[in-house]
């Protein structure tokens, strides 16, 4: 009888121990707490609140669907605006929205032009990983391509401290033209390329069209000797020229706080190519303006005439 009592008490203690361990397990219930809260407002508009502890929000895409506009809102401020062809009837693939820079903040998305009946609401998910492995039969292996998304014009190719920098027109939210960013990759031999985070993203002035980069070795702009300075077209209803600079060999860029640096009444006003002209001791910018090319000069990369 005593032996049976001891065995019963031992079993009870083990059971209680297991329950207690489950209660204090730091991962227990974590996945369940990573929620996506969807509120449909009618007329194609929805508010989606997400858990900021996840690294990515994965959006389901259907190539044949019309574009929906998304506003990413962090602590009540719009930090990003982009268009996505959200899945309505089927999922062709997923694209990631990076949430990693907003830990401990309140993140929501304002979806516009996305019907309540669309499949996307059931398929979107939070994840700490995004598999961008190249499994496509006809995807180039030798020629550069982004890890995912769409690219075209190479921009701002520059060499500094043993590294070649390739920037390019990039849509990280689909496989068609749109949402223009500057993508970025680095190589030491022009053959093997290492993908980098987006270098320059759209802002209130517009999306990021083509341009060029220079290395300001003499610090003419005052950003710092050896700064990589990028010039690009900010494109919205009108096109203006803007500038950003990097002090860490292109790993991050800071936009010039007095953008735009050059404006025009011409609707087509884009694609700045900047270089140093030794004879005049000035920087020269070549711009496509309407149906002609125009030349501008500057002593400091900021003030152009």
PLM regions with names:
Residues 1-2, 271:
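Intrinsically disordered, low-complexity regions enriched for glutamine and histidine
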Residues 13-25:
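Bacterial N-terminal signal peptides
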Residues 32-272, 276-305:
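Beta-rich carbohydrate-recognition and catalytic domains
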Residues 2-13:
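Bacterial N-terminal signal peptides that target proteins for export
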Residues 25-31:
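Sec-dependent signal peptide cleavage junction
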């Amino acid at each position: 009888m005593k032996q049976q009592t001891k065995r019963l008490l031992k079993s009870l203690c083990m059971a209680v121990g297991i329950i207690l361990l489950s209660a204090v397990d730091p991962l227990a219930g974590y996945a369940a707490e990573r929620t996506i809260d969807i509120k449909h407002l009618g007329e194609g508009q929805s508010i989606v609140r997400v858990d900021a502890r996840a690294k990515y929000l994965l959006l389901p895409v259907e190539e044949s669907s019309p574009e929906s506009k998304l506003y990413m809102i962090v602590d009540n401020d719009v930090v990003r605006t982009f268009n996505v062809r959200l899945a309505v009837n089927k999922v062709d693939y997923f694209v990631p929205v990076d949430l990693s820079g907003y830990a401990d903040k309140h993140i929501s998305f304002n979806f516009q032009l996305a019907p309540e009946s669309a499949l996307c609401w059931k398929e979107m998910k939070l994840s700490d990983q995004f598999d961008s492995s190249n499994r496509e039969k006809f995807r180039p292996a030798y020629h550069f391509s982004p890890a995912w998304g769409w690219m075209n014009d190479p921009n701002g190719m520059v060499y500094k401290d043993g590294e070649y920098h390739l920037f390019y027109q990039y849509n990280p939210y689909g496989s068609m033209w749109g949402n223009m960013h500057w993508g970025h990759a680095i190589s030491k031999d022009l053959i093997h390329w290492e993908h980098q985070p987006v270098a320059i993203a759209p802002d209130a002035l517009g999306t990021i069209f083509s341009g060029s980069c220079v290395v300001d070795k003499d610090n003419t702009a005052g950003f710092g000797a050896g700064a990589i300075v990028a010039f690009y077209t900010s494109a919205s209803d009108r096109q203006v020229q803007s500038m950003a600079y990097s002090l860490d060999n292109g790993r991050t860029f800071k936009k010039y706080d007095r953008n735009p640096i050059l404006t025009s009444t011409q609707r087509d006003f884009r694609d700045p190519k900047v270089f140093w002209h030794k004879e005049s001791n000035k920087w020269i910018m070549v711009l496509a303006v309407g149906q002609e090319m125009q030349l501008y000069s500057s002593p400091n990369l900021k003030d152009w005439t």
